């Protein structure tokens, strides 16, 4: 599969660092952001092969990020994977089902991250 450029967006530092460290060990170029606004800025600056994004975050949540990306960077939509504990919540469940964006539910395993990278990066290259 090779080295991928991956963005990790999560307001929880421990989660963000866990994902980033696991992906770096696999040899990937990893960038991080602690909210959707910072993530959107990075999406505007770099071409990412994959974006792991939390849903519930301050300043700009994952749903607002998705809507901005859909409008301004539609080519990135097929590269997003939501990593969230909110997959079945009343707030985000209907949104997730309507987008068809892949979801990894928290708590997750490193194997789930590896599988997502393998599947998503293979589709976008």
Predicted regions, residues:
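Charged docking surfaces used in two-component/phosphorelay signaling
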Residues: 17-25
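Receiver (REC) domain active-site loop signature in two-component systems and cognate sites
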Residues: 57
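Short hydrophobic/Thr-rich beta-strand motif most characteristic of the beta2 strand and flanking loop
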Residues: 27-34, 42
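Acidic catalytic/metal-coordinating carboxylates
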Residues: 34-38, 61-65
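C-terminal output helix
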Residues: 99, 108-117
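Hydrophobic/aromatic residues positioned on beta-strands within the core alpha/beta folds
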Residues: 81-84
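Active-site residues of response regulator receiver
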Residues: 54
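Conserved phosphotransfer cores of two-component systems
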Residues: 44-46, 60, 69-78, 96-98
């Amino acid at each position: 599969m090779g080295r991928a450029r991956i963005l990790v967006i999560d307001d929880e530092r421990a989660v963000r660092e866990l994902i980033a460290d696991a992906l770096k060990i696999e040899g990937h170029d990893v960038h991080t952001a602690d909210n959707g606004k910072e993530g959107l800025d990075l999406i505007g600056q770099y071409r990412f092969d994959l974006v792991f994004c939390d849903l519930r975050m301050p300043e700009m949540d994952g749903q607002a990020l998705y809507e901005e990306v859909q409008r301004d960077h539609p080519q990135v939509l097929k590269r997003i994977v939501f990593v969230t504990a909110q997959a079945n919540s009343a707030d985000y469940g209907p949104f997730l089902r309507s987008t068809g964006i892949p979801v990894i539910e928290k708590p997750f395993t490193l194997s789930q991250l590896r599988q997502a990278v393998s599947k998503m990066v293979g589709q976008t290259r």
